[in-house]
From Swiss-Prot:
<dbReference type="Pfam" id="PF00293">
    <property type="entry name" value="NUDIX"/>
</dbReference>
<dbReference type="InterPro" id="IPR015797">
    <property type="entry name" value="NUDIX_hydrolase-like_dom_sf"/>
</dbReference>
<feature type="binding site">
    <location>
        <position position="54"/>
    </location>
    <ligand>
        <name>Mg(2+)</name>
    </ligand>
</feature>
<feature type="binding site">
    <location>
        <position position="90"/>
    </location>
    <ligand>
        <name>substrate</name>
    </ligand>
</feature>
<keyword id="KW-0539">Nucleus</keyword>
<dbReference type="InterPro" id="IPR011876">
    <property type="entry name" value="IsopentenylPP_isomerase_typ1"/>
</dbReference>
<comment type="function">
    <text>Isopentenyl-diphosphate delta-isomerase; part of the second module of ergosterol biosynthesis pathway that includes the middle steps of the pathway. Idi1 catalyzes the 1,3-allylic rearrangement of isopentenyl (IPP) to its highly electrophilic allylic isomer, dimethylallyl diphosphate (DMAPP). The second module is carried out in the vacuole and involves the formation of farnesyl diphosphate, which is also an important intermediate in the biosynthesis of ubiquinone, dolichol, heme and prenylated proteins.</text>
</comment>
<dbReference type="InterPro" id="IPR000086">
    <property type="entry name" value="NUDIX_hydrolase_dom"/>
</dbReference>
<keyword id="KW-0479">Metal-binding</keyword>
<feature type="binding site">
    <location>
        <position position="152"/>
    </location>
    <ligand>
        <name>Mg(2+)</name>
    </ligand>
</feature>
<dbReference type="GO" id="GO:0009240">
    <property type="term" value="P:isopentenyl diphosphate biosynthetic process"/>
</dbReference>
<comment type="pathway">
    <text>Isoprenoid biosynthesis; dimethylallyl diphosphate biosynthesis; dimethylallyl diphosphate from isopentenyl diphosphate: step 1/1.</text>
</comment>
<feature type="binding site">
    <location>
        <position position="72"/>
    </location>
    <ligand>
        <name>substrate</name>
    </ligand>
</feature>
<keyword id="KW-1207">Sterol metabolism</keyword>
<keyword id="KW-0414">Isoprene biosynthesis</keyword>
<feature type="binding site">
    <location>
        <position position="77"/>
    </location>
    <ligand>
        <name>substrate</name>
    </ligand>
</feature>
<dbReference type="GO" id="GO:0004452">
    <property type="term" value="F:isopentenyl-diphosphate delta-isomerase activity"/>
</dbReference>
């Protein structure tokens, strides 16, 4: 059942509710754009169970020691609150500069979106993360329920970046962050005190640790496939 506006205002953070009105790119299973849909529409399991699918990205930032920057999502987040995840996970919007019908156009769009959201969530200025240094690797199609009425059903573009960044955390988006080595992340996965987003665990289980071993040559892992997970 879709919750009433009055109930939402009582239960959820005002800023996070506002962001639920942003317009995502609804796609088919081949990542062909069909129309726009609000973030709220795209994340309701009622719609996901009918096949609604949207475009997303997952950014992984590594420092000069090849440590991965993780974030813990804020308690205020409507979907997957307080879970640990990769550096930044969000969506290109159905706006100029972030749309894309062909794969090269779509990759450029998600890079623009990633730069926008890295600033919004982590306060990373564009000068530290030039888009021409973003490495697109592949796309992953997955579905995962969250709590209550919410979930994810995405074609997720994977982006890598290696470099030094300065952070200015937005507490409405992120409650904590840390840099980890591959072994430290594996230890976190086995520690029950940590909870993780399903897409991050899925990416790590199927792809991430192989990519991480050769992060300086990540371009060799690039493909044009959509991996169904």
């Amino acid at each position: 059942m879709i919750m009433s506006s009055q109930q939402e205002k009582k239960d959820y953070d005002e800023e996070q509710l506002r962001l639920m009105e942003e317009v995502c790119i609804v796609v088919d299973e081949n990542d062909v754009p069909l129309r726009y849909g609000t973030k709220k529409e795209c994340h309701l399991m009622e719609n996901i169970n009918k096949g609604l699918l949207h475009r997303a990205f997952s950014m992984f930032i590594f420092d000069e020691q090849n440590r991965l920057l993780l974030q813990q999502r804020a308690e205020e987040k409507i979907t997957f609150p307080s879970l640990w995840t990769n550096t930044c996970c969000s969506h290109p919007l159905d706006v100029a500069g972030e749309r894309g019908n062909t794969l090269p156009e779509a990759v450029e769009g998600v890079k623009n979106a990633a730069q926008r959201k890295l600033f919004h969530e982590l306060g990373i200025q564009a000068k530290y993360i030039p888009k021409d240094k973003f490495q697109f690797l592949t796309r992953i199609h997955y579905l995962a329920p969250s709590t209550g009425a919410w979930g994810e059903h995405e074609i997720d573009y994977i982006l890598f970046f290696k470099g030094k960044v300065e952070l200015d955390i937005n507490p409405n988006e992120v409650q904590a962050y840390k840099y980890v080595t591959m072994e430290e992340l594996k230890e976190m996965f086995s520690d029950p005190q940590y909870g993780f987003t399903p897409w991050f665990k899925l990416i790590c289980e199927h792809f991430m640790f192989k990519w991480w071993q050769d992060v300086d040559h990540a371009s060799k892992f690039q493909d044009t496939l959509i991996h169904r997970c």
